[in-house]
Amino acid sequence: MLFTDLNGDQARQTIDTEQVFAAYAAARTELDHRYAGSMAWKTVGSHTYLYRKRQGVWKSLGARSSATEEIHSGFHQGRERVQDRITNLAARLDEMAPVNRALRIGRMPIIAARVLRRLTEARLYGPVVGVVGTNALYAYERLGGVQIAGPQLATGDIDFLYDARKSLRLVAPEAAAGGLLAELQKVDRSFTAVGNPGFRAVNRDGYLVDLIMPAGTDPIRRPPRNRIGSAADDLQAVEIERLGWLVNSPKTAVTAIDARGYPVQMWVIDPRAFALHKAWLSTRGDRDPLKRSRDAA
């Protein structure tokens, strides 16, 4: 069989894990946005002012008063509450991980999950790049409430589809500077680019990360930006024909679970678009015959 349905225990544990992870992710987002930076009193001359620091810049919130004292206490008490919530939810995920492994619902390779978490932290994953290829099946099997047969999931790489139309202003500054390769090296320092410029990175274990993008259709227009970072050694996306409709397809967020039993957020194209793309690939004469058979499956 190409897939099997989740049993009752697996389904229940999957849902429970997703709910805890959603609460954890929401708390992390609240901490990063509402309580980012720091807040402190500063004395200037004979007066004391409340200052808020964000992205390395201090800004005055006004002279010390009952109102600014309330702002100060609210900030620090609120941040402490959120940090406590994150700690408790993280501990809960630690408790659930071995159960997830025992029930065999942890599916995604650990290295792939670590890469996705790093790119999510850098705000690259989702708005700028999305997963296509075999690893997307971990999201699709969750959407279907099934587990796909192992041979269909076997892969030693992960493919990222780059949408060059997206602005990099919301990307973490260090990611916009160093690019995809620098973020991969934060996961595993052995990642290096294959070729110069290259669209592929490989680590010491032979795990591959490919960056692809749609080929331009207008020879007159300026070619689209083909790399994320400004670093000269960053990966340069390879242009592939007929990927434009994948970039334009609706995206969906799905929680997968890695082989250690920990959840990871995935952003993938609509499964119907993925299926059509694979069906088209299976008919291409220039496609590797071994890959064509997997595409058709």
Question: Can you say where each PLM-predicted feature lies in the sequence?
Answer:
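Compositionally biased terminal segments of proteins
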Residues: 1-48, 53-297
